[in-house]
């Protein structure tokens, strides 16, 4: 106790901050702030390289910090606002690894001058200012600090131990993504439409979260997860105040992970956003949202499991069915992958509904496998191009296996992983979640999941047949040669997908060792 505190017993004590436990997030947010300063003070010609080195270096340093923290005791830090436990470290490490892959795609500018991002975000589509910016060779580098802020929010979201911290994290990860979604160079109006839709629906989602937070506080007199759980055990669990509050918070979380019926933004945003940003959102945001969902429902509202489990069952079934059936009708490869991500969210929810330790670890493993196959798949989408940008219509992919066997083969590998076929990580990911769901008493969900997997396998295999079993068009698309950074991102996805398909046990053991969540 300081002399001032001893002399003033009514003084507010200074908070004790465990900087070692917070170091990974501090590094990421520090790099994001440094990136803003780079935009202000570094000459334009040097910004791209500076931002790339700064961002990649920061992500690697943060990942090293996460690994170094694995030996620390599990405890609540930052005045109990953040849980420094096994799931936090596992999810943060996954987010950082996926962010490195996504940032490699964002930084790669080898396919034409700024083929993915508009030269100046403020330029109107088709305007003279936009043409002048392109002719001047201007490069959009604000994406780096924006992406780093989003990564920081993704890391904080599943680590939050109270609803206010979770809401702050939700906004920190969401606001940069609203901007990044509108920065596509090609199809500018579609990109800006995607950004507006994402922003408006995201604002409604945030409003639901805040309203639910207020109701939960009115019931529990606290926003800390542990205090909420204690209040549930000490009073009437069926109180309408807590039920409505939980429902509103659940809606906000299901929106972020594209659960039905809160999924309608996903195809439009995935299609309109720059493809590297789509990969970043599809992988990183879903991992962070599921991590937050696990902590909120298992730690804070575990006492209401009998109330929310039937709802999760219904959402999981609807999510798998909608993602599988509507995916069949898609002719745009990015929209197809969007519905694929919706179906995958349903598969993860089957294990989540089991509410067992095995379900927690299986969800963590699935998120790792899904994230890397998604990054790799969108990286391949960037390479298949027409004169006006990416060739996203499936008719343009006909015969791709004969034009570029390597690119088509790698894309086929990622599709097989999404279908859950050997020898890929997708097989063991689905085995893990379906086994956990069955053992947890969610057998009907497993049946629906297997049937939905068969339907999704159809549209994955349909693309493979298009690429390898049909003759290419005379004037087909070109396949760009990826630069070193994009090649590294693709290689990362391939390596993780294949290695986890052959030797999944080390990561399964790591996920099992990470759980349970600190309560």
UniProtKB/Swiss-Prot annotation:
- Annotated Gene Ontology cellular component terms: plasma membrane
Keywords per UniProt:
Cell membrane, Membrane, NAD, Quinone, Translocase, Transmembrane, Transmembrane helix, Transport
Q: Name one GO molecular function term.
A: NADH:ubiquinone reductase (non-electrogenic) activity
Instruction: List its EC numbers.
Output: 7.1.1.-
Q: State whether keyword Nucleus applies.
A: no
Catalytic activity field: a quinone + NADH + 5 H(+)(in) = a quinol + NAD(+) + 4 H(+)(out)
- Location of this chain's protein in the cell: Cell membrane
Which branch of life, at top level? Bacteria
Question: In this entry, which stretches build a coiled coil?
Answer: none
Q: How does it sit in the membrane?
A: Multi-pass membrane protein
* Xref: InterPro entries: NADH-Q_OxRdtase_suN/2, ND/Mrp_TM
The enzyme's first-digit EC class, named in words, is translocase
Q: Which GO terms describe its biological process?
A: ATP synthesis coupled electron transport
Task: Provide the transmembrane region boundaries.
Answer: 22-42, 53-73, 87-107, 141-161, 163-183, 198-218, 242-262, 287-307, 310-330, 336-356, 363-383, 406-426, 442-461, 483-503
Q: How does it assemble?
A: NDH-1 is composed of 14 different subunits. Subunits NuoA, H, J, K, L, M, N constitute the membrane sector of the complex.
Which protein family is named in the record?
Belongs to the complex I subunit 2 family.
What function is annotated for this protein?
A: NDH-1 shuttles electrons from NADH, via FMN and iron-sulfur (Fe-S) centers, to quinones in the respiratory chain. The immediate electron acceptor for the enzyme in this species is believed to be a menaquinone. Couples the redox reaction to proton translocation (for every two electrons transferred, four hydrogen ions are translocated across the cytoplasmic membrane), and thus conserves the redox energy in a proton gradient.
- Write the protein's name: NADH-quinone oxidoreductase subunit N
């Amino acid at each position: 106790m300081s002399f001032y505190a001893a002399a003033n017993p009514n003084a507010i004590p200074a908070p004790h901050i465990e900087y070692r436990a917070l170091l990974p997030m501090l590094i990421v947010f520090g790099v994001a702030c440094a990136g803003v300063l780079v935009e202000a003070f570094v000459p334009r010609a040097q910004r791209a390289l500076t931002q790339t080195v700064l961002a990649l270096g920061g992500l690697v340093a943060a990942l090293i910090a996460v690994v170094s923290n694995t030996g620390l005791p599990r405890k609540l830090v930052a005045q109990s606002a953040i849980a420094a436990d096994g799931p936090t470290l596992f999810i943060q490490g996954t987010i950082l690894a996926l962010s490195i892959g996504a940032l490699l795609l964002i930084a790669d500018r080898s396919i034409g001058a700024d083929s993915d991002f508009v030269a100046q975000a403020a330029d109107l589509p088709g305007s003279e200012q936009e043409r002048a910016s392109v002719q001047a060779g201007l490069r959009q580098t604000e994406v780096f600090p924006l992406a780093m802020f989003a990564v920081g929010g993704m890391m904080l979201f599943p680590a939050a131990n109270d609803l206010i911290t979770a809401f702050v994290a939700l906004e920190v990860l969401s606001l940069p993504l609203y901007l990044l979604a509108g920065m596509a160079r090609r199809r500018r109006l579609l990109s800006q439409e995607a950004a507006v839709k994402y922003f408006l629906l995201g604002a409604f989602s945030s409003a639901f979260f805040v309203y639910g937070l207020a109701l939960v506080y009115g019931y529990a007199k606290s926003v800390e997860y542990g205090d909420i759980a204690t209040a549930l055990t000490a009073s009437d669990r069926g109180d309408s105040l807590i039920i409505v509050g939980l429902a509103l918070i659940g809606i906000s979380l299901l929106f972020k992970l594209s659960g039905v019926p809160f999924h309608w933004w996903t195809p439009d945003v995935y299609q309109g956003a720059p493809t590297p940003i789509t990969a970043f959102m599809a992988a990183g945001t879903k991992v962070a949202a599921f991590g937050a969902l696990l902590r909120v429902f298992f730690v804070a509202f575990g006492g209401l499991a009998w109330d929310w489990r039937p709802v999760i069952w219904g959402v999981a079934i609807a999510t798998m069915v909608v993602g599988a059936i509507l995916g069949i009708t898609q002719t745009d490869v990015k929209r197809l992958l969007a519905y694929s991500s919706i179906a995958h969210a349903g598969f993860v929810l089957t294990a989540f509904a089991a509410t067992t330790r095995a379900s927690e670890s299986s969800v963590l493993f699935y998120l790792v496998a899904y994230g890397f196959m998604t990054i790799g798949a969108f990286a391949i989408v960037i390479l298949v191009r027409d004169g006006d940008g990416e060739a996203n219509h499936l008719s343009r992919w006909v015969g791709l296996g004969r034009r570029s066997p390597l690119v088509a083969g790698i894309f086929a590998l990622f599709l097989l992983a999404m279908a859950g076929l050997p020898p890929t990580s997708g097989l063991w990911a689905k085995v893990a979640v379906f086994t956990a769901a069955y053992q947890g008493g969610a057998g009907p969900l497993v049946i629906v999941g297997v049937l939905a997997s068969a339907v999704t396998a159809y549209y994955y295999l349909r693309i493979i047949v298009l690429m390898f079993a049909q003759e290419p068009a005379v004037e087909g698309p070109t396949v760009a040669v990826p630069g070193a950074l994009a090649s590294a991102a693709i290689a990362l996805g391939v390596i993780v997908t294949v290695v986890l398909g052959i030797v999944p046990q080390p990561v399964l053991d790591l996920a099992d060792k990470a759980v349970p969540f600190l309560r």
